[in-house]
Amino acid sequence: MKSYIEPFIASKALSQNSQKAYRYDLQQFCQLVGERVNQDKLLLYQNSIANLSLSAKKRKLSTANQFLYYLYQIKYLNSYFRLTDTMKVMRTEKQQAAIINTDIFYQKTPFVWGQLISLLILELGLTPSEVAGIEVANLDLNFQMLTLKTKKGVRVLPLSQILIPFLEQQLVGKEVYLFEHRGIPFSRQWFFNHLKTFVRSIGYEGLTAQKLREQFILKEKLAGKSIIELSDILGLKSPVTLEKYYKS
C-alpha cells in the first residue's frame, strides 16, 4: 500500500509543505495498518492518534480518508473504508484508555534520549523521577535486571531483551547516573523536553509520561497481573490508585 502514496500525492494539487505533511501522515498510517485494510486495523490507527490535538487528529483523519477513497477508486481496495470519530474507543470517567501500538517507539530516531525515557516508562512503568534516579551501578545488563532504589524502598525489575540495546548505547561514558552530565543528573525540565520532542516526532504529540505509564498498567493487566502484583511492580504503598483499571 505504501507504493501508492506517491501516485496519490501526485494526483492532488498540493504545495510542497502540504506534500510533506501528506507523505508523513500516510507513511505512519501505512505502517500501522499494513497492506490489508480492515476495520480492526483502522480502529488501531484511530486509537493511536487519540491523544493528539483536535487539529492534528482532524488533519490525519482527512488525509487517511482521502487516501482510502483513492485506493478504492483505483480498485486496490474492494470495499470503501472511512475513518470517523465514532470508530475510536471513547474515554469517559468509567472507561479505560485504549492500548496503543508502540512499535514505532522502538524504531531508529535522532532523539535517542527521549526515546529511552519513553521506553523505560513503557517497559517498566517508571515515573520520570524514577527514570532520573537510575544509577549505572544498579543496571545489570548481563542478568537483565534493574535495581531501583527510591525513598519508598528497593525494587528489582526485569529488563526485556528488546530494551538492552537501547541501554547499552546510552551507558557509554556514564559515571553515576544513566541520564547525566559529568556525574550530575539532568533537571526535571530536561526530561520533560526530551520526552516531548521524541513523542512529537513519532506522531504522538500530547502523549505525556503519565499516559505512557498508563499504557504499562493496561498491558500488565491484560497480561494477567493482579492488582496487588501490579501495585508491587510499581512500588505503590497501596493499590487504591489502580482500582479504576480493574473495575469491570
UniProtKB/Swiss-Prot annotation:
- Enumerate the CDD domains for this protein: INT_StrepXerD_C_like
Top-level division of the source organism's lineage: Bacteria
Task: Name the GO terms of the biological process aspect.
Answer: DNA transposition
Ranges of residues in domain Tyr recombinase: 85-248
Subcellular location as annotated: Cytoplasm
Span of domain Core-binding (CB): 1-72
Q: What do the Gene Ontology cellular component annotations say? A: cytoplasm
User: Where, by residue number, is the active site?
Assistant: 149, 213, 245 (o-(3'-phospho-dna)-tyrosine intermediate)
* InterPro entries reported in the protein's UniProt record: CB, DNA_brk_join_enz, Integrase-like_cat_sf, Integrase_catalytic, Integrase_recombinase_N, Tyrosine_recombinase_XerD-like
Purpose = Putative tyrosine recombinase. Not involved in the cutting and rejoining of the recombining DNA molecules on dif(SL) site.
The family database entries (HAMAP family) matched by this protein are listed as: Recomb_XerD_like
Q: What is this protein called?
A: Tyrosine recombinase XerD-like
The species this protein was found in? Streptococcus pyogenes serotype M5 (strain Manfredo)
